[in-house]
């Protein structure tokens, strides 16, 4: 966006007072230019002030996920070195020696690779190499050594799988009998142990694997998903019996959009696939729970472990189980399976979840299962099912919805799909239509689901084919459900799946408050049994098998946080059976064990909590991203909705951009498992009526409380350390800390600090310093108070204002919009409620400047501080500074105007370019858009607004035909601010055309006629006179001259092309003819605008250019003095407020405002802090 004032060079006030001076070193050999790079500290802390102390810096590092893991590296390196050095395996001893030599060689090669004159090499070795690795050659080598040792140790640690069965504590080597091992009372006998004939180090690796497994289960809630899948397929005669092959062409393949399951008669006798398998599955064929019927036969009772097993022979996908955990479930599962799995987890945990429909009777045909007669399904709502309905009351027919018929042919098939296809096909030829609005008078024949809950009943219905009527809603029905199974039916990209959580309720229990929670010990036992079963192929019979690669899974988990996981494992490992290597490792680690016990669990929990919050965002993105192509097909200029076929929304409601109920699963783990690692759960904040709160606002409060607990824990830990400044090496630019006079801890702390103060990103310490510079300034506190007042007001519709804050509040959404417009995903905060898109702007802004959270946008916060400081500076003393800027930059006679893009005013702005989806609501947003996509409006540059609405009639050549402005409750979008020759939001051609149009129709830029006469009389500039004459020449005189003089004489030349008139004569001529143009000024008998303080309601005109239309109001230098935020004079106060907001966001204006205050003198002890400040420009 262009502002009126522009500066080519951005003034960085906060660096004033900072200096980088040369360190004078006696007999120094580096060149002066090299020494210029050495930072001269002015503080022994990171920066002067409590937040810049050494302890505060370390606290910040140890509570930051990207930095905290480095603090355990020193103790781990001690332990690993001892293990490698004392190991009984000589190859391991040799690896340590070779690695140390490699590190030495690596250091030499790195140093020799520095391109620098020899005399400067010491400077750049220190700054470019050692400062990044703890400050010394020894710390650099230690860091490199650790990286290579931990990589090798990880490979050795997971080279073997040490999961075993130990009945009565005795290692069993088999044979393993399913009927014995499948009994839950046996599961406690599984564990990790070296084999009888073990190799050196096997005992240690087995113990560490056990601890890593324990951490994995506790911190991530591993879940084994059981599933049977039935894939779509085409019948022998092709999909053309139902779908429109002429319209769909090569897009028509068996898929989620065009589902089909061949009938039994179309499946070869020797193939047991599709409908054949489905019929056998719902009958419970080969199920292990022989006391039950139907699908329940695949679910063992609670006392049998609640195991869920599907025979591989009854699934088109032979992999009938999948292991996931809370940190990879979003990435591992397809969107439909993901939603269903999380919904089922929440059901088992007795937490709030989205309601799914229940299928009372499972049909033996898959086609008649995904398309269900409404009488055979209950708990269906507009958010969880789709259907086709009779609608004789709604005469407005949406073509995009009716076009869905083009996906089908008119079928007379007696099946559900045939009837559904026929019904859709009749949409545009009768009173049948696809509707997105529920009505109590409507009825539905068929319902289509993407996820549903099965009851354990079967139906012997005839063989049929299926479909889905896209995105209509259903009438609620009320039935008593019985015998609901803890399973989910899912319609996904592959086919239809039956999903269950294996052992799901077995390892759940009720706590003292009767709340459901995990029994982590039972969960460990269950998972070990299943992993051992897969490892040893201990299945009931050949019909059952699955894969559970535990070792590979543990390694993947380990590598995500290997430093913190390993140190936590060492803390909990019992070294009873010790070889020399393990004994040495234990002794080396024991020196730090007590200290690590206080820190490592908190650090690991902090990182996992952060990752779980990130999983919430990932879930929202995954479920929303599936709709991109669907919406494109509907929203493009030439829509092709039939290509979406039977695609629909998932039955999980999105609120404010978040799938709140599904995200409740991650919140459950955060609050019920991990919060206790860093503090204690505050039930009054996290729960309501014994259920977790799910709104975004409540989740943020929970997050903030947890972050406060983390800060307290880390602060308590650091306060137990002796933190002092370590002597600085020559030429170093950084502060080094010493911890407890211990080299390992000292290295660890400095590695953590270096990760925190990464010079490529804005660091929290630089932010804290800069924030303090603002908050300690009285003017800023005044500015902050003003903005809080603006934010708290609702911006009433009246254009009259009693305070500056009132006017600014009416247009503050323009400032919020500047944040929203930069978003790649503009629907990340959901769809607007009742078209109130301003609420989304505000959400985007508030989140961008939120100073809580794990990923604070420091740059956005500081930019906001500059803005509000500048805003206060502009408005004080009745807009004095704002007016001074305008006076300095708008010359007398220069044309300027305020304009609105009328194309935006007149267009539907509810869904620009389809950013809020489509009328089909594939996102299942609580505020479904009812507007078709407007492809002519760019959401990145039109949403500036005012309360004032410039209603006009088409203009004649004179400006006197303009109508007064009016006001609107919601305001008017399309506001383009103040436009001049050098600055405009409009395209250059449009801006120039409008300037030319004004020049050809107005002399208002000169104020009154008397003002211009005075100016002409006083000027000494020939070019100024020529410019005025040219402007007058473009106008038609409104009266004839009584003295016979005309403007044409001004341009007369003699025989040699010199002007016929001299300067004085030209002045006199212009003064003489000016009365002929009186109608182009304000009334010559009235005082100039600058003196008419009571003049109100200036009027807008209409201008058309290139097929587009604009409403504009000419603005002149004489308008400036009467501008006000509290009274509407020549320009409405809310328009003035919008102009002030634009000016406050201009970086050049911010420079000017900040230069008016006393510049802070920063005392900094570490160049990395200065680097962080530079990134905050």
Swiss-Prot record:
TM helices/strands, residue ranges: none
Keywords in alphabetical order: Cell membrane, Lipoprotein, Membrane, Palmitate, Signal
Residues with lipidation of kind N-palmitoyl cysteine: 27
Family statement: Belongs to the MG307/MG309/MG338 family.
Lipidation (S-diacylglycerol cysteine): 27
One Pfam family hit: DUF3713
Provenance organism: Mycoplasma genitalium (strain ATCC 33530 / DSM 19775 / NCTC 10195 / G37)
A GO CC annotation given for this chain: plasma membrane
Its membrane topology: Lipid-anchor
Stretch forming the signal peptide: 1-26
Protein name: Uncharacterized lipoprotein MG307
Main location: membrane
Keyword Transmembrane helix: no
Cellular localization per UniProt: Cell membrane
Domain of life of the native organism: Bacteria
UniProt-listed PROSITE patterns: PROKAR_LIPOPROTEIN (PS51257)
